[in-house]
Amino acid sequence: MTQQATLSQLVEFYETLDSSRLAQLPQIYHHDIRLCDPVGEHQGLAVVERYFAELLKNMRYCRFIVTLVREFDNDALLLWRMEYAHPALQRGAEQSLEGSSYLRFRADKIVFQRDYYDMGAMLYEKLPLLGSLVLRIKKRLQP
């Protein structure tokens, strides 16, 4: 598979994300994958598979709309919007979060992925007591 084919497969994987698709991860990610996001750092394919399984376990759904893909020699950049619903956040209402991913390839598979998104907007602002505090702090920081 080529780097471009892997990238297309990754986009399709995220746009139709659910736990039944986790078996596709070895076709997309290198066995030495290092995935970094605001939650933490996850090293190795088995660890990344478990991380996805845990994330999806309690979600009502989680899907991505990829709005931009830029491919370079051994790198790529994605811009995306994640739409998700979790019973513990906002009473299970649909949530939306924009973010981006930087990808690096080795042997036509993704060996490094860093996801950038606002963890406050995703989680902290949605929690009952903490959310109002975070929003007040953000308001104070505005000019």
Residue ranges of predicted features:
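Short, aromatic-enriched amphipathic alpha-helices that serve as compact interaction elements
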Residues: T2-S20
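A beta-strand edge to alpha-helix "cap/lid" segment located at domain peripheries
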Residues: K57-R63, R70-P143
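Short, charged helix-to-loop "capping" segments that act as catalytic/coupling loops
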Residues: D18-R21, P87-L89
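Intrinsic disorder/low-complexity detector
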Residues: S20, V39, Y117-G120
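Residues that form generic nucleotide/phosphate-binding pockets
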Residues: F13-T16, Y51, K126, R140
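Hydrophobic alpha-helical core bundles mediating ligand binding, dimerization, or RNAP-core interactions
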Residues: L10, Y14, Y29, F52-L55, ...
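A solvent-exposed, acidic/Ser-Thr-rich amphipathic alpha-helical stretch
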Residues: Q4-L7, L22-P26, H30-N74
